[in-house]
A protein has these predicted regions:
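Short C-terminal tail/terminal secondary-structure segment
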Residues: 2, 241-267
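Alpha-helical segment proximal to the catalytic Tyr-Lys
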Residues: 132, 175-176, 238
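C-terminal helical subdomain
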Residues: 186, 204-250
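Conserved mid-core segment of classical short-chain dehydrogenase/reductases
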Residues: 75, 96-115, 132, 155-158, ...
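Catalytic Tyr-X3-Lys loop
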Residues: 105-124, 142, 166
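Conserved glycine-rich cofactor-binding loop
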Residues: 17-19
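Catalytic loop of short-chain dehydrogenase/reductase
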Residues: 97, 115, 137-179, 191-192
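Conserved glycine-rich Rossmann-like NAD(P)H-binding loop of the short-chain dehydrogenase/reductase
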Residues: 31-48
Length: 267
């Protein structure tokens, strides 16, 4: 029987105090891992997060304020980790930030570069700096992506572009780190019920899903995402590297006009 025990592992999750990031941390913590969660100033309730870990019987997480776009913050973060760990075994690059772009006039080069700085480059820079600080790369690097570079979502242009670059870098990073024993993979999530989803697409989207006869079953819960990432780092999928996998309850395959028409006929 296979038992997942990660009590001797250190897991770093950026943007780890809410949504997918927090759910990922809780999944690893539940398996016994020492979890490090980063956040930006004022973006987390530390007591509530610690309580969530305690309820699972998980080790208390290390919460560190660190902006992924600042190398100085990253160095300070790794110094904090070094106080209790000899390295980072799993790195989950989860932070994403972008300006909404409803119209072409909203495209600004500076805003796009800022999106890359937050949503794409940290996967590369953190991996490099972890090696510099600890003398070894993580065993697993997982980047959180979305299907926005293959499907159109209104005002999602910059996010989609940054995720496309992220996925390309992940594939190449997997080749560069293969001889180091590091697996690099990307998880594309479908619609996830999080605050950031509502901020991007609006609160009424769930009303639309209800009218379409889809409802909550179309959404992933953050916990579904955390379990998928944990599975990639469990050792059972070590034959996979440089892969982009989709976790979306199969919605992308079914989401088309003919399926909408069929549901309309059945009303």
């Amino acid at each position: 029987m296979f038992t997942l025990n990660m009590k001797d592992k250190t897991v770093l999750v950026t943007g780890g105090t809410r949504g997918i990031g927090l759910a990922t941390g809780l999944s690893f913590g539940g398996a016994g891992a020492k979890v490090v969660l980063t956040y930006k100033w004022g973006s987390c309730d530390m007591d509530e997060i610690r309580r969530s870990f305690a309820e699972l019987g998980a080790p208390e997480p290390l919460l560190v304020e660190a902006d992924v776009s600042y190398a100085d913050d990253t160095e300070r973060l790794l110094d904090e980790i070094a106080k209790t760990s000899d390295g980072v075994d799993v790195f989950v690059s989860n932070v994403a930030f972008a300006q909404r772009t409803p119209e072409l006039k909203d495209y600004k080069k500076r805003s796009f570069f800022k999106t890359l700085e937050y949503s794409t480059w940290p996967m590369v820079e953190y991996t490099q700096m972890i090696k510099e600080r600890f003398g070894r790369y993580p065993s697993y690097v997982v980047a959180v992506s979305s299907d926005g570079d293959e499907r159109h979502y209104p005002a999602y242009d910059f996010v989609a572009a940054s995720k496309g670059v992220l996925e390309t870098f992940a594939r190449y990073l997997a080749v560069h780190l293969q001889d180091e024993g590091t697996r690099v993979n990307v998880v594309r999530f479908g619609m996830v019920k999080t605050e950031s989803f509502e901020q991007m697409f609006g609160e009424r989207f769930t009303d639309f899903l209800d009218e379409e006869g889809l409802g909550d079953q179309s959404f992933l819960e953050p916990g579904d995402c955390g379990k998928a990432i944990l599975a990639l780092c469990s050792g059972l999928l070590d034959a996979m590297t440089g892969q982009v996998i989709t976790v979306d309850r199969g919605l992308a395959f079914q989401d088309n006009l003919l399926m909408r028409y069929q549901r309309w006929q059945e009303r």
